[in-house]
Structures are given as structure tokens and as C-alpha cells.
Amino acid sequence: MAQINVIGQNGGRTIELPLPEVNSGVLHEVVTWQLASRRRGTASTRTRAQVSKTGRKMYGQKGTGNARHGDRSVPTFVGGGVAFGPKPRSYDYTLPRQVRQLGLAMAIASRQEGGKLVAVDGFDIADAKTKNFISWAKQNGLDGTEKVLLVTDDENTRRAARNVSWVSVLPVAGVNVYDILRHDRLVIDAAALEIVEEEAGEEQQ
């Protein structure tokens, strides 16, 4: 069980969560799946049938002393078609839900092990003002020297933080392995953290 300190408006508390041991292979598998799913897959080349060339034979088969050729659309000529080039396709594939949930729990565990996890019992951000968020961040050791991923469904907090250059904001439903790993710190609602870990635990059973 991992001991996680939770900060809040009415003081702090400690929660215990069954964080798994970090496995870089699982994290790599989940990140690869995420990035593959994001690929647009629009790369496309023209085949020899699609390039704008005449189909006429370049010159006679015999008598010129040159190599034998047909038309100019073949891949050996500049401006010819591309052999076996890319065509629009989907790079998406299915990764088991159990692996995805385990990867998410491991990503959170990696931030906890490095002391880069901040769990919060309700954000005290008044009026959705950016200056109020920055003041709150400084009080809790966030001074802008690190990239921060903020995960919360609190609308005031999300609006207050979205203009801060070193903060990325995600709703609880959007938390994912790739974004956790590419940020230095994870700031997350304690309730959301417990839900994520509970789901991961159910998948492992």
C-alpha cells in the first residue's frame, strides 16, 4: 500500500492505495497504443496508374542501343509512380482494457515514487481567476519550473488554469498514461485518484 498525502481546504489527510510496481514494458505498450490511435494515417502516394503520364512507349524496342523501356510512368523514372508506397489507413488497434487500466495505475505510481504526485481534496480557486490559481500553486510548491498536468472536473479550477503556460488541464475522464508521463508533476483530485485506482484493482482481479 502506498501512503499518499492529500492537501485540502480543511487541512491534509493520508490515503492508502494499492499502487502496482512500475513496469516500463507495460507503460511502453500503452503509450505506443495511444500514439498509434492518434495517427491520422493520411499519407498517400500515386501508383504508376495514377500519375499524369502518357501510356505511349518511349521509343522502339530495337535499334536505338538504349535499354528497353515502356512508358514513363514506371517507378524508375523521375515523376513516375511509387511502388508499394503508403495509402490512407488506420493505425488503430485494440489493447486489452486490463492492460490499459494497469498502465494508468503504473503511470500514477511512477509519479508517486518520484514525489511528483499532488492529490487535492477540492480546489479552493475563487472566481476562476488565473492569478488565484497561480497563488494557490505557489502555496503548494508549484512555481512554474516544471510542466504540470492538472486533472479535475472542477470548472472554476479548469478555467483558472487553462491560461497558465506550464499547466495542461484534463477532465477526470480524459486522464491517460501518455499525458501523465510527458509532464513532470501530476495534480489530481483525490476522489478521482481513488476511482482510477479502484478500477485498475478490479481489472487485475
From Swiss-Prot:
GO terms for molecular function: rRNA binding; structural constituent of ribosome. Pfam families: Ribosomal_L4. Keywords: Ribonucleoprotein, Ribosomal protein, RNA-binding, rRNA-binding. One of its GO terms (cellular component) is ribosome. Coiled coil: none annotated. InterPro entries: Ribosomal_uL4, Ribosomal_uL4-like, Ribosomal_uL4_dom_sf. GO terms for biological process: translation. Belongs to the universal ribosomal protein uL4 family. One of the primary rRNA binding proteins, this protein initially binds near the 5'-end of the 23S rRNA. It is important during the early stages of 50S assembly. Part of the 50S ribosomal subunit. Contacts proteins L15 and L34. This is Large ribosomal subunit protein uL4. It comes from Deinococcus radiodurans (strain ATCC 13939 / DSM 20539 / JCM 16871 / CCUG 27074 / LMG 4051 / NBRC 15346 / NCIMB 9279 / VKM B-1422 / R1). The gene is rplD.
